[in-house]
Swiss-Prot record:
Family named by the database record: Belongs to the fungal hydrophobin family.
Source organism (scientific name): Schizophyllum commune (Split gill fungus)
Disulfide-bonded cysteines: C27-C88, C34-C82, C35-C69, C89-C102
Protein's name in the database: Class I hydrophobin SC1
Main subcellular location: secreted
Gene symbol of the encoding locus: SC1
């Protein structure tokens, strides 16, 4: 009887275990950014087109690059929401137009 009770309690305890989660409006490397476009730098055709339009050599980049990004200080407050792609970027910028090392985040706007 005790063994079956322990077996039943195990999934309940596992489900109740707290899992740490990062805040939706914070990035470890800087503010949340709202980017008009995300470019996967593995797609060299897309990277070359964006680079040519902006006058930048993006060929050596890896990961995602956010194009035309602006910081979002408080998500959803005062009209400061993002209708395109919300990302966290590692902070490297080119001419203020391209952020590299970006990771999309879901903030439920």
């Amino acid at each position: 009887m005790r063994f079956s009770l322990a077996i039943l309690a195990l999934p309940v305890l596992a489900a109740a275990t707290a899992v740490p989660r990062g805040g939706a409006s914070k990035c470890n490397s800087g503010p949340v950014q709202c980017c008009n476009t995300l470019v996967d730098t593995k797609d060299k055709h897309q990277t070359n087109i964006v680079g040519a339009l902006l006058g930048l050599d993006l060929g050596s980049l890896t990961g995602l690059a956010g194009v035309n990004c602006s910081p979002v200080s408080v998500i959803g407050v005062g009209g400061n929401s993002c209708s395109t792609q919300t990302v966290c970027c590692e902070g490297t910028q080119f001419n203020g137009l391209v952020n590299v090392g970006c990771t999309p985040i879901n903030v439920g706007l």
